[in-house]
Amino acid sequence: MPKANRLSKLVKTTSRLPKALRTRLWSQAFGRIVPMVGSANIRYLQVSHSEVVVKIENHRAMQNHIGQLHACAMALIAETATGFVTGMNVPDHCIVLIKSMHVDFKRPSKGAMTATATLTPEQQQLMQTTARGETLVSVTVMDESGEAPVQCEMLWAWLD
C-alpha cells in the first residue's frame, strides 16, 4: 500500500464526494499550490498514486494565433499531470522539481486536451522510499479527436 503524504491525504479525504464537486475542489486546491495551473484553468479528472489525468479546454486565454491550444499550454498539461503524480508519491519533506522536458509537436491540436500521467509500482516504491532520485514519468496527451498531437517525455527529480 502506498505511503500517504499531505497531497495523497487530501485526495483520499475528497474521494467520496461526487465527481463534479471533487474535480472542482482538486482543481481549486491544486491551483493554489501551483498558481499557474489555476490561472490556466486546468481541471483534475483523476488523481491517484499511479495516475493523474488533467484537462484543459481550448479557451481564448490559452490559444495561439490560429485558435488552437498554444504549444505552451500543451506542454503545461503534460508537466502538470506528471508533476502531480510524482507529488502524490514523494515524502512531504521532499521537493519535487522537473529536470527536463522534451515535447515533440506532431500536428495541430483539435479542441480541449487531456494529459494522462502514469507511474509503475516500481517508480512509486522508489519515490516513497528514497530521499532523492529521478525518474522519467510516462504521459500521453490527447485532443478531442482522440489523437496525440504531441509526444512528451518528462524527467522529474525529488530531493530532501
Name each region found by the language model:
Residues 54, 99-101, 115, 135-137, ...:
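Hydrophobic residues positioned within well-ordered beta-strands of beta-sheet architectures
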